[in-house]
């Protein structure tokens, strides 16, 4: 779905929004459904993998056996072209893990509906509301500091706890000025986390973190470039007065293990819609707890709300309050979770607790 405006972060531009709706039908009459993901380049391949490979693999299985079904998908012999899966083919591996994630999330929704409880209760039920922050501060054409300040005040009016603010597209000095002026406007009780989207060298990231220390920044997210994730993150972590976040691009618990042990991150923001679904995410959360690492989640509030509510070391659920940035969040669910006093409240209905708008699905369906 093409967006009305262009939204730019430290290293990218967003011009469209996509998602994948997955449904599982059981002989008990339960329909497990979930939506997530935003990969326009590979989404059709993900759909084909689910239909052509996972569907015949899973039909007839007990939907309650989520761990067994996850392993069955992960260890199956998948043919995604002219290469085998277990070679250095990151694109195909990513397709596999996103396909597993789509099926796995729908399975958990079915499981919650079967047992008549919300998914977060199945996962541990640590709290019934999670603090919520907006994703904003994008670089947009013609958008000056006044408009940026107004955007942040609008988030406060929406009762957001704070914002994840984009940095990294201009100089460190310019970004510090942007953040400092926003801090003046929103006050000290409004959370500001900064997201560089892998824009900086370690030295630039360290310079930003040191300069931003007086501004009470909750964390710096993905500060270094993709090819320097482990050593670069370690360097920033050791010299930054601000907690360091990474993990949204990792697709398995094994990559997250390396970020924790070698990258020494303070927080993991793994995306369950990319990294194998709920089953894999909860294993990553368990790993993180052993190292006193907190858990965040990259976007996708419809599933992250349940995950973060189920553990003691979960942080903020993230949403795009601007319908121009994420029209799917506003149009696809029939009703969205309530936001009140800086928190998003958990649904009380079984499963993931979000019914989908069939008219929207029909209008934008691509496959």
Per-region residue spans from a language model:
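Conserved, mostly hydrophobic/aromatic
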Residues: 29, 54, 103, 116, ...
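Metal- or metallocofactor-binding catalytic centers and their adjacent structured scaffolds
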Residues: 25-114
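Histidine/acidic-residue-rich catalytic or RNA/ligand-binding cores of hydrolases
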Residues: 42-47, 257-262, 280-283, 301-314, ...
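Flexible C-terminal active-site loop/helix
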Residues: 296-367
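Structured beta-strand/loop patches that form or line metal/cofactor-binding pockets in enzymes
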Residues: 1-39, 324-330
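Active-site mouth loops of central-metabolism enzymes
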Residues: 130-147, 168, 196-201, 245
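N-terminal small/glycine-rich loop or linker at the start of catalytic domains
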Residues: 118-140, 178, 185-189
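Catalytic core of soluble alpha/beta enzymes
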Residues: 165-298, 334
